[in-house]
Amino acid sequence: MLILALLQLTVTAAPTAAPVPAATVVEYLLPRPKAFPHDPAVGRDGIVWYTDQANSYIGRLDPATGQVTDYPTPTQASGPHGIVVAPDGGVWYTGNFKGRLGRLDPATGAIKEYVLPAAARDPHTPLYWGGKIWFTSQGADLYGALDPATGQAQLFPVPTPGARPYGLVGGGPDGSIWMALFGTNKIGRIHPADGTLKEFTLPDAAARPRRLVVDAKGIVWYSDYARGQLGRLDPATGQVRDFPCPGGSGSQPYGIAIGTDGRIWYNESGKNEIVAFDPATEHTETVAIPTAGAVVRNMAVDSSRARLWLALSGTQRLGRIDLAPQR
């Protein structure tokens, strides 16, 4: 089933602080009242896209001008959650409340929605990989892949009950897809050719991986939300290491990314801070978020411009950190 819509609202958001050196959060106040940015994504042109989950809009921020354009999703109260920009520039999102995937054409603003099978009732995090849109369905204990050419989605059950598949990322030398099983102490590796899954059990039963990234060597880094740890999994050996968050066991690490500076960036929801961890030295740097009450559910890296973008949920803001160049 296909749903089309074309409607937009354009306004301007000015940064709440002037551009400043790296390791400082520059905030952009969004003009829509009670805007709730959930996840960000950035295109090759530097445009920042985000999901406004509470108001069911897809937002577009031009950092050069501060201009913000809102695009309502065709399905009302769809609850757009995750977002990703495909290589062709298409902006894909998950309609978390209504079981949909959507694609926004950045040239026209038109949105095409795909209705997922009923079993995939709460699509969560999307990933463009190998020409398909992969996604997790947290409450349904499923993950799936949509073929945009046919509009058909294939669903795969997670073997572990109550797994709550959450964060999803592709990368590493073997091109695998990695999935955080937030309801368990497990991380899954998906073989994209056939969708088969291998689960890696973390040694601490209390571990709860929420978001994850993969570095160039294939090492999986993840935010252990329940224990206040940054985790490191080496798939080749199965070895797991924990690095305590500066904010302690109640810091609630959530969004995570690998910066152009080679550091692992993540947020501490319980402390309203961003942390940069250097894998080479194991040194951490903490950066305060200016506005209180921010929860960074996800991050996006603009590698071309050495910028880290944050969705500051609960504050009606996006955030930017200027990073060091690629190393």
Regions from the language model: what does each represent?
Residues 62-66, 105-109, 147-151, 191-195, ...:
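Short loop/turn segments that connect beta-strands within beta-propeller blades
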Residues 37-70:
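N-terminal, post-signal-peptide region of Sec/Tat-exported proteins
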Residues 17-34:
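A short helix->beta-strand "capping" segment at the edge of beta-propeller domains
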Residues 33-45, 76-88, 117-130, 160-174, ...:
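Beta-rich, blade/repeat-based domains predominating
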Residues 295-327:
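Blade-level signature of beta-propeller repeat domains, shared across WD40, Kelch, NHL, RCC1
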